[in-house]
């Protein structure tokens, strides 16, 4: 393990229900999510892979794993950020998504950057 601690990574998520692509009568609810990944540490961090756990209101779970995000493995320099938008489909009007990124440091170490659970919900479903 390096004497230097890994960079501090903060993630901000904004979700959006895509009504025009959704089909509630067929249990198809489409959501986009935009994630901004900020590197608040010292040194660069490269996003190597992602892990997502998506759970709908019925408890149905879907795990998504893969290299990078949206076809990229961005290197995020100190005090910089990377933003991308992707999407998911669930069978209920409410769900939750959470996960992490595996990041690589300049010295070849890897660490997890956690993404706290965030809600997927059609507008006005929750008061």
UniProtKB/Swiss-Prot annotation:
Domain of life: Bacteria
GO annotation terms (biological process): error-free translesion synthesis
Ranges for domain ApaG: 3-127
InterPro entries recorded: ApaG_domain (IPR007474), ApaG_sf (IPR036767), Uncharacterised_ApaG (IPR023065)
Pfam families hit by this protein: DUF525
Cross-referenced NCBIfam families: PRK05461.1 (NF003967)
PANTHER family associated with the record: F-BOX ONLY PROTEIN 3, POLYMERASE DELTA-INTERACTING PROTEIN 2
Matching HAMAP family: ApaG
Protein known as: Protein ApaG
Annotated source species: Photobacterium profundum (strain SS9)
């Amino acid at each position: 393990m390096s004497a230097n601690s890994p960079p501090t990574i903060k993630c901000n998520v904004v979700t959006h229900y895509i009504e025009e692509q959704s089909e509630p009568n067929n249990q198809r609810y489409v959501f986009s999510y935009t994630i901004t990944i900020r590197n608040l540490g010292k040194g660069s961090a490269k996003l190597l892979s992602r892990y997502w756990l998506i759970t709908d209101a019925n408890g149905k779970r879907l795990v998504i794993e893969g290299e990078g995000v949206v076809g990229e493995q961005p290197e995020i320099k100190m005090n910089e950020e990377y933003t991308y938008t992707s999407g998911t489909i669930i069978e209920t009007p409410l769900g939750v998504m959470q996960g992490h990124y595996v990041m690589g440091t300049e010295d070849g170490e890897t660490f997890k950057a956690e993404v706290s659970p965030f809600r997927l919900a059609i507008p006005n479903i929750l008061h």
